[in-house]
Amino acid sequence: MPGVSVRDVPAQDFINAYAQFLQRQGKLEVPGYVDIVKTSAGNDLPPQEAETWFYKRAASIARHIYLRKQVGVGALNKLYGGAKNRGFRPHKHVDASGSINRKCVQALQKIGVLEISPKGGRRISENGQRDLDRIAAQTLEEDDE
């Protein structure tokens, strides 16, 4: 479908489709510690999906950067952070793990989806935009059927 972009597809459908694409492609460099690490200091446990959560995080980061001009790792830490349960005391926002987000961004940059922005942070590359639009069109076609 010509003219289909990531904005035209529901977020969850696109993220799942792009994560499956990244996993099938096998080029995304996954750190060895992803099956035991927590994603934030505010979390009690690591993610339930030990094999696929890193691909979903990378797909979500790619979509987030696609929808904006450029994004840095600090903004991603704030985005993926959440409330820390402090018992009887009020909840407070805790940023997500910077290491995980940095490794996702570096892996996406290595396969050519992202590039360094001269203004700071990362932005989507032309090849990355083409890939994401192609996956979005395929996802939209599957939803129509």
From Swiss-Prot:
Location in the cell: Cytoplasm
Annotated stretches, region: Disordered: 120-145
Compositional bias (Basic and acidic residues): 123-134
Keywords tagged on the record: Cytoplasm, Ribonucleoprotein, Ribosomal protein
Molecular-function annotations in GO: RNA binding; structural constituent of ribosome
Keyword Cytoplasm on entry: yes
Assembly and oligomerization: Component of the small ribosomal subunit. Mature ribosomes consist of a small (40S) and a large (60S) subunit. The 40S subunit contains about 32 different proteins and 1 molecule of RNA (18S). The 60S subunit contains 45 different proteins and 3 molecules of RNA (25S, 5.8S and 5S).
Free-text function comment from the UniProt entry: Component of the ribosome, a large ribonucleoprotein complex responsible for the synthesis of proteins in the cell. The small ribosomal subunit (SSU) binds messenger RNAs (mRNAs) and translates the encoded message by selecting cognate aminoacyl-transfer RNA (tRNA) molecules. The large subunit (LSU) contains the ribosomal catalytic site termed the peptidyl transferase center (PTC), which catalyzes the formation of peptide bonds, thereby polymerizing the amino acids delivered by tRNAs into a polypeptide chain.
Full protein name: Small ribosomal subunit protein eS19
Native species: Candida albicans (strain SC5314 / ATCC MYA-2876) (Yeast)
